[in-house]
A protein has these predicted regions:
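Short, aromatic/basic amphipathic alpha-helical patches
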Residues: 65-76, 237
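Glycine/small-residue-rich loop that forms an oxyanion/phosphate-binding "nest" at active or ligand-binding sites
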Residues: 71, 76-96
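Glycine- and other small-residue-rich loops at beta-strand/loop junctions that grip anionic moieties
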Residues: 5, 35, 125-126, 151-152, ...
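Short acidic-hydrophobic, aromatic-tinged amphipathic segments that line or gate anion-handling sites
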Residues: 2-9, 78-83, 174-184, 245
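RNA substrate-binding interface of SAM-dependent RNA methyltransferases
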Residues: 107-207
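Boundary-proximal intrinsically disordered activation/regulatory segments immediately upstream
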Residues: 1-66, 154-155
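Active-site/ligand-binding-proximal alpha/beta "capping" segment
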Residues: 200-252
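Structured adenosyl-cofactor binding patch, chiefly the S-adenosyl-L-methionine
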Residues: 99-101, 139-143, 157-171, 235-272
C-alpha cells in the first residue's frame, strides 16, 4: 500500500533521506546492511537476483508507469510517494525514472566460491569512483568475463550510482571482495595463483606485451587486473603478475580511463 509523504521527518524515510551509503552498508552489522536501488530496470534486476525489498519510494507520475509491474508483485512492501520536487528535496538528488527501492544486502560469497569453474575474471584494485565501477561491471557482464573481484579500497558496486551506471549488471555477474583478513596484494595474488589463474596487469610499461599477444590470449585461466586512474596499479602488483599488458593507441594518446580500458581488455581477453 502506498502512503503519501506528509512528514519528511518520518523515521521510515530515514534510509532515503538521512542515512549515508556507508551507514546503510553497516545498518545491521555484523549482518549485511541495506542499499538503495534506483530506476525500475535496476530494481527489477536486483529482485530477479534474489534481493529483498524493504520499501519503495516512487514519484507520483510513475505509479502508473514503469514501476507499476514491479509494485504489483510486492503489494505488502511499504511504499511512499510524492511529486518530483518533493522527492528531490527529500533525497537531495534527482531521481532517475522516478523510483527508488531500499533493499537488504545478501551475504557475499568467498573468492574461492566466485572463482569455481570460471576461466576469466576481472580484478579491480582501489577503483574508488562509483561511475567507473558501474561502467566496468557493465562491460565485464557484456564482454565475456565470468566474475569480478575487488580489493577493499574499491567503491561498493551496490552504491546507488554504481548500480545505476551499471544498468543493474552488478546483479548479473558474480562478484565479491577479497577477505579483509587477506593482505593485498601479497595474499590476494597468492590466492589467484593457488586457484590456477595467470595474472595480467593492465599497465603502460616498456616491457608490456600487446593485448593481442597469442600466449596471453591462449591462457586457460586469466585474471585481468586494473587499477585506479592516475596512480595506476602498484609496482609490486605489476612485478608479481605473469603479464604486463598494454593497449596500442594512436594520435599520441598515452592512456585511456580505467572504464574504457576495461572494455577493450574484456573484449580482447574475455572468454568467447
Amino acid at each position: 500500500m502506498f502512503n503519501e509523504i506528509k512528514d519528511f521527518a518520518a523515521p521510515e524515510l530515514d534510509v532515503y533521506a538521512r542515512t549515508s551509503e556507508v551507514q546503510l552498508l553497516r545498518y545491521y552489522e555484523p549482518e549485511p546492511g541495506i542499499f538503495i536501488a534506483e530506476s525500475p530496470k535496476v530494481i527489477e534486476r536486483a529482485l530477479k537476483a534474489g534481493y529483498q525489498p524493504i520499501s519503495f519510494l516512487v514519484e507520483h507520475k510513475d505509479l502508473e508507469g514503469e514501476a507499476q509491474e514491479i509494485l504489483k508483485q510486492y503489494p505488502d512492501v511499504p511504499g511512499y510517494t510524492a511529486e518530483y520536487e518533493l522527492l528531490v528535496k527529500l533525497t537531495g538528488f534527482a531521481l532517475t525514472r522516478g523510483m527508488l527501492c531500499a533493499m537488504r544486502r545478501n551475504p557475499l560469497p568467498s573468492v574461492e566460491e566466485i572463482c569455481r569453474n570460471v576461466s576469466r575474471i576481472a580484478v579491480l584494485e582501489n577503483v574508488v569512483n562509483p561511475t567507473n565501477i558501474g561502467d566496468i561491471f557493465r562491460s565485464a557482464a557484456a564482454l565475456h568475463m565470468d566474475a569480478v573481484l575487488l580489493t577493499g579500497g574499491c567503491s561498493d558496486p551496490l552504491y546507488r550510482r554504481a548500480a545505476r551506471v551499471s544498468m543493474g549488471t552488478v546483479f548479473q555477474i558474480p562478484w565479491t571482495y577479497f577477505n579483509k583478513k587477506n593482505v593485498w596484494p601479497q595474499d590476494g595474488m597468492q590466492i589467484l595463483q593457488n586457484l590456477g589463474f595467470k595474472t595480467a596487469a593492465m599497465a603502460l610499461r616498456d616491457d608490456s606485451v600487446g593485448i593481442d599477444d597469442k600466449a596471453l590470449r591462449s591462457e586457460e585461466k586469466l585474471a585481468v587486473i586494473l587499477g585506479p586512474e592516475g596512480d595506476g596499479l602498484a609496482s609490486q602488483i605489476i612485478a608479481d603478475c605473469d603479464y604486463t599488458v598494454k593497449i596500442p593507441m594512436s594520435h599520441g594518446v598515452d592512456s585511456l580511463n580505467v572504464a574504457a580500458a576495461s572494455a577493450v581488455a574484456f573484449w580482447e581477453l574475455g572468454h568467447r
